[in-house]
Amino acid sequence: MSSKDQLKRAVCETIDRHADTIIDLGETILRHPETGFNEVKTAALVADQMRALGLAPRTGLALTGVKGRLAGGAPGPRLAFIGELDSLRTSEHPLADPVTGAAHSCGHNAQIAGMLGAAIGLTKAGIAGHLAGDIVFFAVPAEEFIDVEERAARVAKGEIEFMLGKPELVAKGHFDDIDMSMMIHTGSRDAAEARAFLAKSSNGALVKRIRFLGRAAHAGSLPQLGVNALNAAMIAMNAISAQRETFWEKDTIRIHPIITKGGDAVSVVPAEVTMETFVRGGSLEAIVDANKKVDRCLRAGAMAIGAEVEIHTIPGYLPQRNDERLGQIFGANVETLFGPGQFHIGGHRTGSTDMGDLAHLMPVIHPYVVAAEGKAHGADWRINEPRHGYLTPAKLLAMTAIDLLHGDAAPAKEILAQFNPAMTKEAYLEFQRSLFRTERFAYIEEEARRPKIG
C-alpha cells in the first residue's frame, strides 16, 4: 500500500495537471450566478462533471442539489466534501447578472471548483482503493438566506419545508448516509494574514419577516385620517437600536433590519410596510433572548402609532462549532503546502452559515483559504489569486481525506467515536419546526377620529 505522503503527492500533481479545467470551472460559475434554490445551470454543470468522472450523481435534491459518491477500497466512514451552489444579490458588482442582480460576492464559485477539483484529483490519481470509506461530493443549494418572500412562497406551495439548503437536505434524508463533512470557503486578506484559517465558532440566527399595517390617506391634505405604517416601523427600528446596550458582549448579538417596502406613493400615508431582519447570536439561548426583545420592539412600534404588526419568525442558522481534531488535520496539510505559520486558528466569527446546523449532528469543519480581496458580500469582492483560490481548496480537501481514510481510517473513526452530537436528527427537526411562528397584534382603531367642524 502506498504511504499517505505518496498519495498526497500524487493527488496534488494530478490537480496541478488539470489546473486549467478547475480554474475554468470556477470562472464559468462566477460569470453565471444564480440565487438559492434557482441554481439550475450551476447544478447541471456540476452533474456533468461528476458524470464524466464516473461518480453517478443524484440530482434535484432539495430542488437543485447534486450528490456523487466515490467508494473506497473497503467499508468505513463516509466523508462529505460540500460546495455551495448559490450566489448573493449584489447588483453593483461588475459581474452581477444584469437581470437578477445576482453575483458571486461571497466566493461560492470557488467552493464548487475546489470540490470538483478534489474529485478530479482523487479519481484520476486512483486514490480510492487505498481508502476505507466513501467520499461524497455534495453540491448544495441556498446557503445565503435571501429572497425571503420568494422562499416563503415555495414553502406555502410545498416545494420546500425549510428556507436554507442544508436544513432542507437534512429533512429529506440526504445527509443520512454521511458521517462527517467539510467544506472550504474563500477568505480575504482582511480576515487573516495566513494562507488559510479556521474560526472556532460562528453565530447562529433567526430570521424575521415583519408587516406593519396602517390606513392609507392623502399625505398632504388629510394625514390625520391615516395610520402611518412606516412610522410604526421606524419606531420599532429605533427601539431595537435602544436595546443594544442590553446585549452581553459574549453573546455577539447582531440585529440588522431592512425595509423591503416603505409605502406605495409619496402622496399616500403608508398603509403597508414590510421589513426583514436577522437576529444573530453566539448561542441558542442568546438568540432566543434577543428575539424576545426584538418582538417587544416590533409590538411597541405598532402600539405607539395605533397600527397592526404581523411577525413571522423563521428558523435560520444554528451556531457553528468546528471540530478541533478535524481542524488540526486540515491545518497540518495547509502547513505542508505553505510552511509553518500559514494556518491560523481564530476565535468566534459573527457571521452565520448552515454548516452550523450540520455541526449539531456530525463533526464538521468550515475553514477559509485566503485568496480574495475586497469586502465579502460587497461589489469589490473578487478572487485575486485564481490558482490559490481554486486549486488549493481542491488539494486540501483531498489531502485531508487521505489523512482521515487511509488504511483502516483510524483517524476518522477516532473523531467519530469522540464526537457527541448536540442533537439527534429527530430532535433537530423538531426544534427547527418549533421556531416557525406567525403572530399578529392589532392596535388600530376602527376609524380614525375626524376633527369637529364649526
Language-model-detected regions and their locations in the chain:
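Metal-dependent amide/peptide-bond hydrolase catalytic core
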Residues: S2-Q6, L230-G454
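Acidic/His- and Gly-rich active-site-bordering loop/insert found
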Residues: S3-S105, N109-V136, P141
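Divalent metal-coordination and catalytic microenvironments
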Residues: I29, G68, F81, H108, ...
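Short glycine-enriched loops at secondary-structure junctions
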Residues: G83-L88, G187, N203-A205, T260-G263, ...
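Short connector loops/turns at beta-strand edges and beta->alpha or beta->beta junctions
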Residues: E84-H93, A142-E144, R211-A216, T274, ...
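Histidine/acidic-residue-rich, glycine-tolerant segments that coordinate divalent metal ions
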Residues: H93-S105, N109-A110, L122-H256, G263-V268, ...
